């Protein structure tokens, strides 16, 4: 059977068929497979699209595109982008993106017979315009069709020196060619045909050599049993069939033209234990990669360094260091070698902190243009001077994060999961190898944390709002399946990238689940608080059976007066019989209400009494400044349990209603403490200062922001701040231990007194 007779195949000339007969039978029926066989064969017009005649339906589509482009030709690019952003979910959004591309080509390119311009250079400028206007660009294949449609007489030629040649469009040029020559150019591997949501920056020609050096270094690092077992478990779970179309793993991507795919990368240990191979010595490094363009090993770990900064390189084969502001697993390290399923086997311990009420995002910012990722230089293990590679990776990852944030903002959660699935495939092998390198894992972790922070800021007003049930169902589905989805997507990539992406997603999923629990319990508590009869029943049982002074004296060992006053104020909020108008506006007659409360009242909360109670508990931690957040939550839970126990033992009827309210208080206060610790950026600034202090040899002065250059000049003051922070934490730990010892002594004394009273009573009775 002649291959040209197959449906959809382009007719080949006799000379082309002779070349085809010499190929392998498997390759014979795939014309695209013949492209890399012979360089002269690439320029034959018989297998290119120039000789192909479009079908009738294609002619109609091209005519329609030309007509639409002619109608919108007088519009500015800003107005076209605004219309595209408004109709980005409609059925005609893809066609209108093509119209935008044609309009941009008419403004940016012009025909000239003796001109030639790189094919990727035109696409790079188009992507840059789309990035500045915050719209999703077309992929390179669709954009190339538009170039052919607008300029049908151009030809594609491969020009340049051997080994450095690039594809060029011959017959057109960019308008103002001199102004574009100052910009960097793309290499052919910098863009992928499926890159439809990334905004890449131009990458120099030596970028692939730089990444291959990193890859060769990574391949020589020995893999630990824990990481291999963990990655194998995740890969085993990844191949399980799933009904979710977004949970399918992506195809494996060959790295830098290698014949083997990256199926299971080793776990990267500390680089100082593995020196660079002989083939990567300074004498063998190409001239364009000299002077620290290949990342150097990290300096040896100093014993005198603080615990907060004791790991210059993340150890992915073991658990995190306790005491840091990040989330640490509570499992034993030996158990982490047996299972890596974060969704079911790892329990995370969040840093808790009660932020002031005015710092909580009750009214989040909707300006996505202000979003920015942390600089890469602060989170690199060693000096890395390839500015172009870092800029390209940062720009692509920033666009990916912005797309995810906007998907959650408009509740397009299917698009959220689809973007996560398509992101690895949209990267070129060079950028994917750089993303999987252990030198950038710390930056990826911080970037994902910044992105998830912005998403939680958008969702934070749901704490006390009435949310439609379909939205709750979608968010609950996202919280339950995000970790498994990311694990299946990155199962075929390096183990360090898989672990970082999975851990940050698990933290976000836990916080999102906590937010949904707060919203559910708030609705349940509002049913009782909005009913005057239930509230009257609670207050009646409280007056009859609860003695706040006795409960505080029995459960706590400090701040008795303040704790008694807090319980009495809580009772006064419950006992207030509000009229319907006051329920809608509980702060109508309270001039001392804070601005935060006024902002939340404007958001039309669930219930006035619930809103007032939320304000009370939100301000309550500030009354106990010497109490840590975790100790505060334990004491609050002990007081509520004691109140419930007194009412239950005494036969009160308000136990059920008070129990539901208590559940909401526990969830709400835990959520406020967890989100406060997660959104707190004071530790991030301190960590960046420390990274600047220790990596000053690898960061040029021009790359350091002005507000951080002062810290580089005052190293002694920074060390004093670190020592002061250590001493303050040590004092706090000593104070907590003394408080626990006093509490235990008080409990023991109470038990002894109780036993003596029982014995005296029995003796008197006998």
From Swiss-Prot:
PROSITE patterns tied to this protein: RFX_DBD (PS51526)
Phosphoserine sites (modified residues): 223-224, 227
A GO cellular component annotation in the UniProt record: cytoplasm
Listed Low complexity bias regions: 290-308, 715-731
Residue ranges of DNA binding: 101-176
Subcellular location: Nucleus
Residue spans of biased composition, Polar residues class: 279-289
Coiled coil residues, start to end: none
Family: Belongs to the RFX family.
Described function: Positively regulates cyclic AMP-dependent protein kinase-mediated exit from the mitotic cell cycle.
Name the record gives this protein: Protein sak1
Species of origin: Schizosaccharomyces pombe (strain 972 / ATCC 24843) (Fission yeast)
């Amino acid at each position: 059977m002649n291959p040209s007779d197959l449906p959809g195949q382009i007719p080949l000339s006799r000379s082309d068929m002779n070349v085809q007969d010499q190929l392998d039978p498997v390759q014979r029926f795939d014309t695209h497979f013949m492209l890399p066989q012979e360089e002269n064969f690439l320029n034959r017009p018989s297998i290119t699209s120039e000789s192909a005649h479009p079908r009738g339906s294609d002619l109609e589509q091209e005519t329609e595109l030309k007509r639409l482009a002619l109608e919108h030709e007088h519009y500015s690019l800003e107005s076209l982008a605004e219309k595209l952003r408004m109709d980005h979910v409609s059925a005609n959004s893809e066609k209108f993106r093509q119209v935008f591309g044609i309009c941009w080509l008419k403004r940016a390119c012009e025909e000239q017979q003796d001109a030639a311009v790189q094919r990727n250079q035109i696409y790079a400028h188009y992507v840059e315009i789309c990035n500045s206007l915050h719209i999703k660009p077309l992929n390179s294949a669709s954009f190339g069709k538009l170039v052919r449609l607008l300029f049908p007489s151009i030809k594609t030629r491969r020009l340049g020196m051997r080994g450095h040649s690039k594809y060029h469009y011959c017959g057109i040029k960019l308008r103002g060619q001199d102004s574009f020559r100052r910009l960097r150019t793309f290499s052919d591997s910098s863009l992928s045909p499926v890159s439809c949501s990334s905004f890449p920056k131009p990458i120099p020609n030596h970028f692939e050599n730089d990444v291959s050096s990193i890859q060769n270094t990574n391949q020589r690092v020995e893999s630990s049993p824990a990481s291999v077992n963990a990655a194998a478990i995740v890969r085993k779970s990844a191949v399980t069939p799933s009904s979710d179309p977004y949970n399918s793993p992506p195809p494996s991507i060959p790295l830098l033209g290698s014949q083997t795919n990256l199926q299971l990368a080793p776990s990267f240990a500390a680089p100082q234990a593995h020196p660079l191979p002989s083939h990567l010595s300074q004498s063998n490094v190409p001239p364009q990669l000299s002077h620290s363009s290949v990342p150097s090993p990290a300096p040896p770990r100093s014993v005198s360094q603080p615990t907060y900064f004791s790991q210059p390189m993340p150890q992915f084969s073991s658990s995190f260091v306790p005491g840091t502001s990040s989330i640490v697993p509570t499992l034993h390290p030996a158990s982490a070698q047996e299972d890596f399923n974060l969704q079911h086997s790892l329990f995370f311990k969040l840093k808790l902190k009660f932020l002031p009420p005015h710092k909580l995002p009750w009214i989040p910012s909707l300006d996505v243009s202000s979003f920015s990722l942390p600089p890469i230089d602060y989170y690199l293990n060693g000096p890395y001077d390839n500015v172009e590679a870092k800029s390209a990776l940062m720009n692509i990852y920033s666009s990916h994060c912005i797309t995810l944030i906007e998907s959650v903002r408009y509740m397009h959660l299917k698009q959220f999961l689809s973007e996560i699935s398509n992101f690895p495939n949209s990267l070129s092998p060079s950028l994917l190898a750089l993303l999987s390198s252990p030198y950038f894992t710390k930056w990826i972790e911080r970037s994902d944390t910044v992105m998830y922070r912005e998403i939680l800021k958008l969702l934070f007003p749901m704490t006390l709002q009435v949310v439609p049930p379909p939205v709750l169902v979608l968010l609950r589905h996202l919280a339950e399946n995000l970790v498994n989805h990311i694990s299946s997507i990155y199962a075929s990539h390096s183990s360090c990238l898989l672990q970082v992406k999975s851990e940050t997603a698990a933290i976000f999923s836990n916080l999102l689940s906590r937010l949904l629990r707060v919203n559910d319990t708030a609705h349940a508590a509002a049913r009782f608080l909005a009913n005057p009869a239930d509230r009257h029943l609670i207050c009646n049982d409280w007056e009859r059976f609860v003695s706040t002074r006795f409960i505080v004296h029995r459960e706590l060992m400090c701040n008795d007066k303040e704790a008694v006053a807090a319980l009495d104020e809580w009772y006064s909020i419950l006992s207030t019989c509000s009229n319907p108008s006051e329920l809608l506006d509980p702060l109508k007659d309270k001039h001392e209400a804070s601005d935060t409360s006024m902002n939340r009242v404007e958001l039309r909360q669930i219930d006035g009494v619930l809103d007032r109670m939320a304000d009370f508990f939100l301000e309550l931690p500030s009354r106990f400044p010497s109490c840590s957040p975790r100790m505060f939550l334990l004491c609050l839970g002990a007081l509520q349990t004691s109140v419930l126990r007194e009412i239950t033992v005494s036969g009160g009827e308000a136990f059920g209603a008070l129990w539901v309210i208590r559940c909401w208080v526990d969830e709400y206060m835990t959520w406020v403490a967890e989100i406060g610790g997660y959104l707190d950026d004071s530790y991030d600034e301190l960590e960046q200062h420390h990274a600047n202090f220790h990596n000053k040899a690898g960061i040029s002065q021009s790359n350091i922001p002005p507000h951080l250059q002062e810290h580089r000049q005052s190293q002694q003051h920074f060390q004093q701040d670190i020592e002061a922070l250590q001493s303050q934490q040590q004092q706090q730990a000593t104070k907590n231990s003394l408080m626990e010892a006093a509490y235990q002594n008080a409990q023991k004394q109470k038990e002894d007194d109780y036993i003596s009273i029982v014995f005296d009573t029995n003796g008197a009775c006998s």
